[in-house]
């Protein structure tokens, strides 16, 4: 009698698809999925989360080195959020190039409909 709670935010889940399909994307509920990364940090401050945790560079934890999300993506979260909100942003082209190959993660799973 339990559920898996997701940690994905709006930028990662619906902006650029920065998650592992059926990995950190395999959840029952996603309470912060409609929040940008900036909003998640603001919520953390409001909840009294330690600044060193809030200010730590985001990482997916998949690599045994010091690379972080921004190193892998090539844009920081502020730039990604700007591109998501404004197609005229100077970051929009790079954002779109990152997003396009990950769109399959954001679409519902296709199903085969069998007629009766």
Residue spans for each PLM region:
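ATP/NTP-dependent adenylation/nucleotidyl-transfer catalytic domains that generate, transfer
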Residues: 2-116
């Amino acid at each position: 009698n339990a559920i898996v709670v997701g940690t994905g935010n709006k930028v990662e889940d619906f902006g650029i698809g920065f998650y592992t399909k059926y990995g950190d994307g395999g959840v029952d509920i996603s309470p912060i999925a409609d929040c940008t990364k900036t909003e998640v940090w603001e919520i953390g401050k409001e909840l009294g989360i330690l600044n060193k945790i809030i200010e730590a560079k985001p990482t997916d934890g998949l690599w045994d080195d010091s690379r972080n999300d921004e190193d892998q993506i090539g844009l920081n979260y502020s730039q990604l959020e700007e591109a998501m909100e404004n197609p005229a942003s100077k970051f929009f082209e790079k954002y779109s190039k990152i997003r396009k190959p990950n769109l399959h993660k954001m679409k519902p799973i296709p199903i085969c409909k069998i007629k009766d």
